[in-house]
């Protein structure tokens, strides 16, 4: 993180594996014996007593999760630079380069910085417009208790060890090296600092490494790694490093282009545009925010690295909010919603690998705590892939973390068609289903439906349960089990495996509770009709079935579609940053572009401090508050869903176009089945050109807002029946149970055209008016 200070610049340093603690487990061995009594209490309506027992017997008595921690700061001091003019600062997200410039005594000083993926170093170039006039002092600082600063030869070095946390000894050892290449001038050293004088330009190289190999192995040599990174990079010229950095970054970033139009507002600084956004016409601000989300994912989730956490990879606190770890009851999943559809599939890999890791560590949790096969995780995890229940039963007594994250494995397959990947992911998909096969239990008061007990609707509780969140057969649990069973069935069929297991899953799936529509015309959050229309809770977990799942559809389940809309209206718009990001996706799925845009306006509300409602900080980081990166990713996903959706049997184009974007274009989006939207142009809210590439072949079903023709003038074939493309197979959602007090209206939808086009692998289809 580059602060951009003039006299006292701070380069705040993070490395993705620098976490507190060391390999550990946090299961509670008392859980299995207490499980029958907890279930009995819940079935009998004694929710509060069940929560008390769960706090004692299920919530961990060990670690409640470890913390993502900073390395420290590299400080640059420029004596005499306190009086400056012409200050300018920018982040070029097309190149991932930060620049700062200013003038002191008629001399222009410039700083240019980037983090090179290829060379594993941070590079900062300092220049002065007058020869020999650049001078500065540099040193490390760090909040860690165990740390050492030194200078070896002319290398500025930091060594440190991460913190102990919750009785787990901090054993991640890290090493940082700063080496400076001068163009003229002098360099002097003390025991802990370097001083540069009489130079015209200086290039600072920073390498960082740790001893972390994987979640169960910290035997790496951080000293050698940091030295190797430095030595490899230091021999290259700045021009070469910069060119390689830009090439490596733009390999991902340049895949998607979005144009929603521009106005004079683009001439203003970003913070002023943010402050004015609600009251001005600035469509390019939305495009900037959209691409900023992609920039953040590219920067915080490189293949082979750790997944983006609650703060991506940017944290300056030894003890950050919520430990800056992985909250898997929404936040971590939201981080990766843009990955596939915004053409960043490779950057999904760190999260997919984390899911595979959890499918290993979660096996012992499933067995020891719940007597089940397969694997599971609760609502949080960390770099050590802990899967125990933490934070108290109100939050932590939730067994669906593993089930939800496993769906990302399936999504990656649906977009790429990579059968080798599916084969590698199948044990995790099967294991998630195996857990539920053993964990589900008949509900004695509800038609013997198979339900999750104990469960909860994340972080929320109905007033009828005396403030307890614990319940049986919660809507979100039912929806996740439905998805877990279906993806395991489909994966097994594709891989021609486990026929008898498929039969078991089908039988059990038929016994899951259907969704319920309650007395307030709402989609019920719980099996009982106890929703409060005045509840404004940030989590609206029962709408998982609308998004990111596709169980609720405007065309297949109109009653559930309308009930979801009612639930969303009851909850309101303004909330935490990430919640508003999720709502953009929901309103896009509800095909209401104007309401989705209203949520974008709410999210792009400037937040000046870490209190109050959610919004956006001046640097465009999402504000929960405090900073959480999930809202950035959620909104980027939602903007994509406004322009293209591909989860309801067809590629639906412009499903939620707001009035404020009457004309525009986008290129590079990915749809399920290996289709790429190479170009989509609309004018006066009408689609005028579409170019689609089919990388896998198969039927291309398009749902369009208006008629288009093939490039040769031929008319399109009207689609009928189910889509023959297997990547667009739809699982039938059970008919809902509707309260006698409800009066559900049929949804009002814009007219669309549905067409089928047979494609071959590699074929490009062009359509126009």
Descriptions of predicted regions:
Residues 1-394, 400, 405, 411-413, ...:
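Aromatic-residue-lined binding/catalytic grooves and analogous aromatic/hydrophobic interfacial grooves
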Residues 331, 398-412, 421-439, 579, ...:
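Extended, hydrophobic alpha-helical segments in both membrane/secreted and soluble proteins
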Residues 342-346, 409-425, 440-443, 485-501:
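Inter-helical turn/loop segments and adjacent helix faces that build the functional surface
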Residues 431-491:
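Acidic/histidine-rich catalytic neighborhood
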Residues 622, 643, 648-671:
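Acidic, turn-prone loop/beta-hairpin segments
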């Amino acid at each position: 993180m580059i602060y951009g200070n003039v006299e006292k610049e701070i380069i705040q340093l993070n490395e993705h594996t620098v976490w507190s603690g060391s390999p550990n487990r946090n299961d509670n061995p008392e859980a299995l014996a207490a499980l029958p009594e907890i279930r009995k209490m819940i079935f009998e309506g004694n929710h509060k007593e069940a929560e008390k027992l769960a706090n004692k017997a299920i919530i961990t008595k060990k670690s409640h999760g470890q913390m993502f921690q900073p390395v420290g700061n590299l400080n640059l001091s420029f004596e005499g630079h306190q009086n400056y003019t012409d200050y300018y600062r920018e982040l070029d997200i097309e190149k991932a380069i930060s620049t700062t410039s200013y003038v002191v005594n008629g001399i222009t000083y410039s700083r240019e910085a980037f983090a090179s993926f290829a060379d594993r170093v941070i590079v900062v170039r300092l220049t002065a417009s007058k020869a020999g006039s650049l001078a500065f002092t540099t040193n490390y600082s760090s909040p860690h208790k165990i740390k050492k600063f030194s200078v070896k030869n002319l290398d500025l070095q930091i060594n440190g060890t991460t913190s102990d946390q919750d009785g787990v000894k901090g054993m991640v050892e890290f090493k940082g090296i700063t080496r400076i290449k001068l163009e003229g001038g002098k360099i002097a050293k003390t025991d802990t600092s370097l001083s540069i004088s009489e130079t015209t330009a200086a290039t600072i190289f920073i390498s960082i490494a740790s001893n972390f190999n994987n979640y169960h192995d910290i035997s790496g040599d951080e000293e050698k790694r940091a030295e190797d990174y430095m030595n490899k990079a230091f021999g290259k010229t700045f021009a070469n490093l910069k060119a390689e950095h830009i090439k490596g970054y733009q390999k991902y970033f340049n895949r998607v282009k979005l144009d929603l139009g521009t106005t004079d507002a683009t001439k203003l600084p970003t913070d002023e545009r943010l402050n004015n956004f609600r009251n001005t016409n600035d469509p390019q601000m939305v495009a900037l925010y959209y691409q900023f989300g992609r920039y953040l994912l590219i920067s915080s989730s490189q293949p082979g690295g750790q997944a983006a956490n609650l703060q991506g990879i940017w944290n300056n606190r030894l003890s950050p909010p919520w430990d800056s770890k992985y909250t898997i009851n929404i936040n971590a999943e939201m981080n990766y919603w843009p990955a596939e559809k915004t053409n960043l599939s490779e950057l999904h890999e760190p999260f997919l690998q984390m899911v595979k890791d959890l499918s290993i560590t979660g096996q012992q949790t499933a067995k020891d705590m719940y007597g089940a096969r397969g694997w599971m995780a609760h609502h949080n995890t960390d770099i050590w892939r802990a899967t125990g229940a933490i934070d108290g039963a109100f939050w932590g007594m939730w067994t669906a973390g593993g089930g939800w994250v496993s769906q990302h494995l399936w999504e990656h397959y649906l977009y790429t068609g990579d059968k080798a990947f599916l084969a590698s992911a199948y044990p995790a998909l099967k294991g998630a289903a195996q857990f539920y096969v053993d964990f589900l239990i008949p509900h004695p008061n509800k038609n013997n439906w198979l339900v999750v007990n104990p469960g909860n609707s994340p972080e929320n509780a109905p007033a009828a349960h005396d403030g307890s969140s614990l319940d049986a057969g919660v809507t979100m649990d039912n929806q996740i089990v439905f998805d877990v069973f279906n993806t395991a069935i489909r994966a097994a069929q594709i891989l021609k495996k486990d026929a008898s297991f498929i039969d078991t899953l089908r039988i059990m799936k038929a016994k899951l509770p259907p969704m319920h529509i309650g007395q307030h015309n709402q989609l019920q959050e719980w099996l009982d009709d106890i929703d409060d229309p005045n509840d404004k809770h940030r989590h609206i977990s029962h709408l998982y079935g609308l998004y990111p799942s596709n169980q609720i559809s405007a065309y297949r389940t109109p009653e559930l579609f309308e009930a979801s809309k009612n639930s969303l209206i009851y909850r309101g718009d303004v909330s935490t940053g990430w919640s508003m990001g999720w709502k953009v996706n929901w309103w896009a799925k509800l095909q209401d572009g104007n309401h989705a845009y209203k949520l974008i306006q709410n999210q792009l509300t400037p937040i000046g401090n870490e209190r109050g409602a959610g919004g956006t900080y001046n640097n465009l980081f999402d504000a929960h508050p405090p900073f959480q990166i999930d809202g950035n990713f959620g909104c980027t996903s939602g903007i994509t869903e406004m322009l293209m959706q591909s989860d309801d049997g067809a590629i639906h184009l412009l499903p939620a176009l707001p009035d404020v974007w009457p004309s525009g274009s986008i290129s590079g989006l990915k749809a399920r089945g290996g289709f790429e939207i190479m170009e989509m142009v609309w004018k006066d809210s009408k689609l005028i050109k579409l170019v689609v590439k089919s990388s896998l072949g198969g039927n291309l079903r398009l749902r369009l807002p208006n008629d288009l023709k093939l490039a040769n003038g031929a008319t399109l074939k009207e689609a009928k029946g189910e889509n023959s493309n297997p990547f667009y197979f739809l699982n039938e959602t059970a008919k809902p149970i509707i309260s006698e007090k409800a009066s559900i209206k049929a949804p009002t939808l814009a007219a669309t055209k549905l067409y089928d086009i047979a494609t071959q692998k590699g074929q490009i289809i062009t359509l126009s008016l």
